[in-house]
Protein backbone atom coordinates (compact mmCIF):
# COMPACT_ATOMS: atom_id res chain seq x y z
CA UNK A 1 0.00 0.00 0.00
CA UNK A 2 2.23 2.72 -1.32
CA UNK A 3 -0.12 5.51 -2.15
CA UNK A 4 -1.37 8.64 -0.43
CA UNK A 5 -5.12 8.06 -0.97
CA UNK A 6 -4.94 4.75 0.88
CA UNK A 7 -3.00 6.36 3.73
CA UNK A 8 -5.65 9.09 3.97
CA UNK A 9 -8.37 6.44 4.17
CA UNK A 10 -6.51 4.61 6.94
CA UNK A 11 -5.88 7.90 8.77
CA UNK A 12 -9.62 8.62 8.67
CA UNK A 13 -10.29 5.33 10.43
CA UNK A 14 -7.48 5.75 12.95
CA UNK A 15 -8.57 9.23 14.06
CA UNK A 16 -12.05 8.04 15.13
CA UNK A 17 -11.01 6.87 18.64
CA UNK A 18 -9.14 10.15 19.18
CA UNK A 19 -12.23 12.18 18.27
CA UNK A 20 -14.32 10.10 20.67
CA UNK A 21 -11.76 10.44 23.46
CA UNK A 22 -11.60 14.22 23.04
CA UNK A 23 -15.39 14.41 23.04
CA UNK A 24 -15.64 12.50 26.32
CA UNK A 25 -13.02 14.70 27.99
CA UNK A 26 -15.82 17.25 27.71
CA UNK A 27 -14.10 20.58 28.05
CA UNK A 28 -13.98 23.45 25.60
CA UNK A 29 -10.47 22.79 24.26
CA UNK A 30 -11.08 19.05 23.85
CA UNK A 31 -14.36 19.74 22.01
CA UNK A 32 -12.59 22.19 19.69
CA UNK A 33 -9.81 19.71 18.96
CA UNK A 34 -12.31 16.89 18.41
CA UNK A 35 -14.34 19.01 15.99
CA UNK A 36 -11.16 20.06 14.17
CA UNK A 37 -10.03 16.44 13.82
CA UNK A 38 -13.46 15.48 12.53
CA UNK A 39 -13.34 18.28 9.95
CA UNK A 40 -9.85 17.22 8.85
CA UNK A 41 -10.95 13.57 8.64
CA UNK A 42 -13.99 14.63 6.61
CA UNK A 43 -11.80 16.61 4.22
CA UNK A 44 -9.63 13.54 3.60
CA UNK A 45 -12.76 11.88 2.19
CA UNK A 46 -12.66 14.38 -0.67
CA UNK A 47 -8.91 14.35 -1.18
CA UNK A 48 -8.35 10.59 -1.18
CA UNK A 49 -10.76 10.09 -4.06
CA UNK A 50 -9.61 13.18 -5.94
CA UNK A 51 -5.93 12.26 -5.69
CA UNK A 52 -6.60 8.62 -6.56
CA UNK A 53 -8.48 9.55 -9.73
CA UNK A 54 -6.21 12.41 -10.80
CA UNK A 55 -2.94 10.49 -10.40
CA UNK A 56 -4.27 7.06 -11.37
CA UNK A 57 -3.82 5.70 -7.85
CA UNK A 58 -7.18 3.94 -7.64
CA UNK A 59 -6.78 0.59 -5.86
CA UNK A 60 -9.04 -2.26 -4.85
CA UNK A 61 -8.21 -1.42 -1.23
CA UNK A 62 -9.34 2.18 -1.74
CA UNK A 63 -12.53 1.18 -3.54
CA UNK A 64 -13.45 -1.12 -0.66
CA UNK A 65 -12.22 0.82 2.37
CA UNK A 66 -12.98 4.43 1.43
CA UNK A 67 -16.74 3.94 1.88
CA UNK A 68 -16.12 1.85 5.00
CA UNK A 69 -14.00 4.65 6.48
CA UNK A 70 -16.78 7.13 5.70
CA UNK A 71 -19.44 4.97 7.33
CA UNK A 72 -17.26 4.34 10.38
CA UNK A 73 -16.51 8.03 10.83
CA UNK A 74 -20.12 9.15 10.46
CA UNK A 75 -21.56 6.15 12.32
CA UNK A 76 -19.25 6.31 15.33
CA UNK A 77 -19.63 10.06 15.74
CA UNK A 78 -23.40 9.87 15.32
CA UNK A 79 -23.69 7.15 17.97
CA UNK A 80 -21.34 9.09 20.25
CA UNK A 81 -23.54 12.19 19.95
CA UNK A 82 -26.71 10.17 20.55
CA UNK A 83 -25.28 8.66 23.72
CA UNK A 84 -23.75 11.75 25.24
CA UNK A 85 -25.39 14.90 23.92
CA UNK A 86 -29.12 14.23 23.59
CA UNK A 87 -29.12 14.73 19.83
CA UNK A 88 -32.48 13.92 18.22
CA UNK A 89 -32.60 10.19 17.45
CA UNK A 90 -34.76 10.31 14.34
CA UNK A 91 -32.36 12.01 11.89
CA UNK A 92 -29.48 9.99 13.33
CA UNK A 93 -31.31 6.69 12.88
CA UNK A 94 -32.43 7.64 9.36
CA UNK A 95 -28.84 8.44 8.41
CA UNK A 96 -27.43 5.27 9.98
CA UNK A 97 -30.11 3.03 8.48
CA UNK A 98 -29.64 4.50 5.02
CA UNK A 99 -25.87 4.11 5.20
CA UNK A 100 -26.16 0.41 6.08
CA UNK A 101 -28.83 -0.26 3.47
CA UNK A 102 -27.01 1.58 0.71
CA UNK A 103 -23.76 -0.22 1.57
CA UNK A 104 -25.53 -3.54 1.11
CA UNK A 105 -27.25 -2.40 -2.07
CA UNK A 106 -23.95 -1.16 -3.52
CA UNK A 107 -22.34 -4.53 -2.83
CA UNK A 108 -25.27 -6.29 -4.48
CA UNK A 109 -25.23 -3.95 -7.48
CA UNK A 110 -21.49 -4.52 -7.89
CA UNK A 111 -22.14 -8.27 -8.00
CA UNK A 112 -24.68 -7.86 -10.79
CA UNK A 113 -22.42 -5.34 -12.56
CA UNK A 114 -24.72 -2.33 -12.15
CA UNK A 115 -23.10 1.00 -11.34
CA UNK A 116 -24.94 3.84 -9.63
CA UNK A 117 -22.93 7.05 -9.93
CA UNK A 118 -22.75 9.34 -6.93
CA UNK A 119 -25.04 12.30 -7.60
CA UNK A 120 -24.38 15.91 -6.71
CA UNK A 121 -27.26 15.68 -4.27
CA UNK A 122 -25.53 12.74 -2.55
CA UNK A 123 -22.34 14.80 -2.32
CA UNK A 124 -24.34 17.65 -0.77
CA UNK A 125 -25.88 15.14 1.66
CA UNK A 126 -22.43 13.97 2.70
CA UNK A 127 -21.21 17.55 3.13
CA UNK A 128 -24.24 18.47 5.25
CA UNK A 129 -23.84 15.34 7.40
CA UNK A 130 -20.19 16.15 8.04
CA UNK A 131 -20.95 19.84 8.64
CA UNK A 132 -23.78 19.06 11.08
CA UNK A 133 -21.70 16.50 12.96
CA UNK A 134 -18.78 18.97 13.18
CA UNK A 135 -21.08 21.59 14.67
CA UNK A 136 -22.60 19.07 17.08
CA UNK A 137 -19.19 17.82 18.24
CA UNK A 138 -18.15 21.38 19.01
CA UNK A 139 -21.58 22.25 20.37
CA UNK A 140 -22.44 24.99 22.78
CA UNK A 141 -20.04 23.46 25.30
CA UNK A 142 -17.05 23.83 23.01
CA UNK A 143 -17.93 27.11 21.36
CA UNK A 144 -19.77 29.13 23.96
CA UNK A 145 -22.40 29.85 21.28
CA UNK A 146 -25.71 29.11 22.97
CA UNK A 147 -27.74 28.07 19.92
CA UNK A 148 -25.04 26.18 18.04
CA UNK A 149 -26.55 22.81 19.00
CA UNK A 150 -29.89 23.86 17.49
CA UNK A 151 -28.19 24.95 14.25
CA UNK A 152 -26.39 21.61 14.11
CA UNK A 153 -29.64 19.70 14.62
CA UNK A 154 -31.42 21.67 11.88
CA UNK A 155 -28.62 20.89 9.44
CA UNK A 156 -28.71 17.25 10.57
CA UNK A 157 -32.45 17.10 9.77
CA UNK A 158 -31.79 18.54 6.30
CA UNK A 159 -29.04 15.95 5.80
CA UNK A 160 -31.43 13.19 6.95
CA UNK A 161 -34.03 14.35 4.42
CA UNK A 162 -31.42 14.29 1.64
CA UNK A 163 -30.26 10.91 2.92
CA UNK A 164 -33.70 9.43 2.20
CA UNK A 165 -33.95 11.08 -1.22
CA UNK A 166 -30.48 10.00 -2.34
CA UNK A 167 -30.91 6.49 -0.95
CA UNK A 168 -33.88 6.01 -3.25
CA UNK A 169 -31.63 5.95 -6.34
CA UNK A 170 -30.00 2.75 -5.07
CA UNK A 171 -33.36 1.08 -4.46
CA UNK A 172 -34.50 2.20 -7.90
CA UNK A 173 -31.40 0.59 -9.48
CA UNK A 174 -32.25 -2.68 -7.68
CA UNK A 175 -35.97 -2.82 -8.43
CA UNK A 176 -35.57 -5.18 -11.39
CA UNK A 177 -33.91 -7.69 -9.04
CA UNK A 178 -36.65 -7.73 -6.39
From Swiss-Prot:
The protein's UniProt keywords, in alphabetical order, are: Cell membrane, Lipid biosynthesis, Lipid metabolism, Membrane, Phospholipid biosynthesis, Phospholipid metabolism, Transferase, Transmembrane, Transmembrane helix
Q: What is its EC number?
A: 2.7.8.5
Q: Name its pathway.
A: Phospholipid metabolism; phosphatidylglycerol biosynthesis; phosphatidylglycerol from CDP-diacylglycerol: step 1/2
Give GO MF terms, alphabetically: CDP-diacylglycerol-glycerol-3-phosphate 3-phosphatidyltransferase activity
Supply the Pfam families for this chain.
Answer: CDP-OH_P_transf
Question: Topology with regard to the membrane?
Answer: Multi-pass membrane protein
From the broadest rank down, the organism's phylogenetic lineage runs: Bacteria, Pseudomonadati, Pseudomonadota, Alphaproteobacteria, Rickettsiales
Encoding gene, per UniProt annotation: pgsA
Give its localization. Answer: Cell membrane
Q: Domain of life here?
A: Bacteria
Q: Which reaction does it catalyse?
A: a CDP-1,2-diacyl-sn-glycerol + sn-glycerol 3-phosphate = a 1,2-diacyl-sn-glycero-3-phospho-(1'-sn-glycero-3'-phosphate) + CMP + H(+)
* Protein's UniProt name: CDP-diacylglycerol--glycerol-3-phosphate 3-phosphatidyltransferase
GO cellular component terms? plasma membrane
Amino acid sequence: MKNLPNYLTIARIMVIPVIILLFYINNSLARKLGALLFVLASITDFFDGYIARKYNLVTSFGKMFDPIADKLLVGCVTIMLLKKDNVDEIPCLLILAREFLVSGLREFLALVKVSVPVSRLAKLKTFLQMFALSILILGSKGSGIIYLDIVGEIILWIAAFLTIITGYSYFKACKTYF
